[in-house]
Curated annotation (Swiss-Prot):
GO cellular component: a single term: cytoplasm
Stretches assigned to the Radical SAM core domain: 112-345
Cross-referenced InterPro entries: Aldolase_TIM, Methyltransferase_A, RlmN_N, RNA_MTrfase_RlmN, rRNA_lsu_MTrfase_RlmN/Cfr, rSAM
EC number per UniProt: 2.1.1.192
Native source organism of the sequence: Bacillus subtilis (strain 168)
Family label: Belongs to the radical SAM superfamily. RlmN family.
Pfam families: Radical_SAM, RlmN_N
Record: active site: E106 (proton acceptor), C350 (s-methylcysteine intermediate)
Broad class of the protein's primary localization: cytoplasm
PANTHER family according to UniProt: 23S RRNA METHYLTRANSFERASE (PTHR30544), RADICAL SAM CORE DOMAIN-CONTAINING PROTEIN (PTHR30544:SF5)
Cofactor stoichiometry and binding remark: Binds 1 [4Fe-4S] cluster. The cluster is coordinated with 3 cysteines and an exchangeable S-adenosyl-L-methionine.
Catalyzed reaction equations: adenosine(2503) in 23S rRNA + 2 reduced [2Fe-2S]-[ferredoxin] + 2 S-adenosyl-L-methionine = 2-methyladenosine(2503) in 23S rRNA + 5'-deoxyadenosine + L-methionine + 2 oxidized [2Fe-2S]-[ferredoxin] + S-adenosyl-L-homocysteine; adenosine(37) in tRNA + 2 reduced [2Fe-2S]-[ferredoxin] + 2 S-adenosyl-L-methionine = 2-methyladenosine(37) in tRNA + 5'-deoxyadenosine + L-methionine + 2 oxidized [2Fe-2S]-[ferredoxin] + S-adenosyl-L-homocysteine
A molecular function (GO) term: 4 iron, 4 sulfur cluster binding
Protein name per Swiss-Prot or TrEMBL: Probable dual-specificity RNA methyltransferase RlmN
Amino acid sequence: MAELNKTKVRKELRTERPSIYSFELDEIKQWLTDNGEKPFRAAQIFEWLYEKRVSSFEDMTNLSKDLREKLNTRFVLTTLKTAVKQTSQDGTMKFLFELHDGYTIETVLMRHEYGNSVCVTTQVGCRIGCTFCASTLGGLKRNLEAGEIVAQVVKVQKALDETDERVSSVVIMGIGEPFDNFNEMLAFLKIINHDKGLNIGARHITVSTSGIIPKIYEFADQQMQINFAISLHAPNTEIRSRLMPINRAYKLPDLMEAVKYYINKTGRRISFEYGLFGGVNDQVEHAEELADLLEGVKCHVNLIPVNYVPERDYVRTPRDQIFAFEKTLKSRGVNVTIRREQGHDIDAACGQLRAKERQDETR
C-alpha cells in the first residue's frame, strides 16, 4: 500500500496509523490516488467523518469493502476517550479526554445566546509558564496532532447531536500555546473551516496566542479571515513579565510592532485578552496606561474576571473595580467588554480539571 506523501504530512504526526482527522481533503485525495482509488472518494470520506460522524470505517457503507480495509489499515478514526464530563448549571460542559498514550486534555462547550462555542486544546500541558494559569502545572508533555484537535470538536458535536444542536464557533484558547504547535494548528483551522469538513465559518473561529512574535508575522502572512487574539494581561513590561515570563523573550514593544504588522497586513482588528488580578493590574492608573499603549491600534479589549486557581496566589478583582476599569477605557475611546463568566460550579479555569485529575492519580 502506498504511503502518504511525506512532503505533505506534517512532521508532528505519528508514523504509525495517524488519525484520519489529521488530514485535509487534498491530502486524502492524494492518498487515494496513490492507492489506486478514485480521488472523488475523499469527499465521501469527509461526509462520513464530519456530517454523519461515524464511529468506524465499516460504517462508511458507500465505500467498497476493499477501500474500507485500506482505510482501517492505514488510519484510526479517533484516539480520544471521554474520561470525565462535567455540566454546569448554566449549561457549560467541560470534557476531560484521554489520548492514546494516556495523557489527558480539556475541551469546553460554552452556550451563548448566539450559539454554542467550543474551546479546544492544542498541547498536552504548556511551556509558557504564565504565573496565573493551571495549564502550565506539570509543564509541556507534547504537541497534539491536528486530528486530536479536530476530534475534540467532533466529540462535542456528537454530544450536541442528542439535542439537535450545532457547534457554531470555535476558540483556540484551551491548554497550550497554539503558535507553539503552528503547523498542526493551521491544518486544524483548514479542516474545520472547509465546506466539506465541519464548515465553521472563518469569522466564527478565534485563535489566541501569548505572543510568540515570529509566528504572529507568519500568521499574518497567511491572510486568513480567522479572528485573532493576544493574551496581554498587562499595560507595561514590568507587570507583563511578572505575569507572563514569555515577555522576557518577546518584549512588549516588539509585540506591539507585530500587532501593527498583522493589522496592516490583514485589515482586521485584533482582540486583547486582559485578565484582572486583584492588586496587580486592575487599578484605574493601569487602565490609563493600557489606553496609552493601545492608542491608534485597531483593537478590542476583553476584560476577564479571573477564575480562582487553588495552586495560584492571585485573587479576583472586586466587581465595582472591574466596572471602573472598563469605564476608564471607554472614556479613552477603547472598544472594551467584560467577558461573561461561565462554569462557576465546575472546574472552569483552563487546565484546572486536568490538574485536579493528575492530583487524584498521584494520591
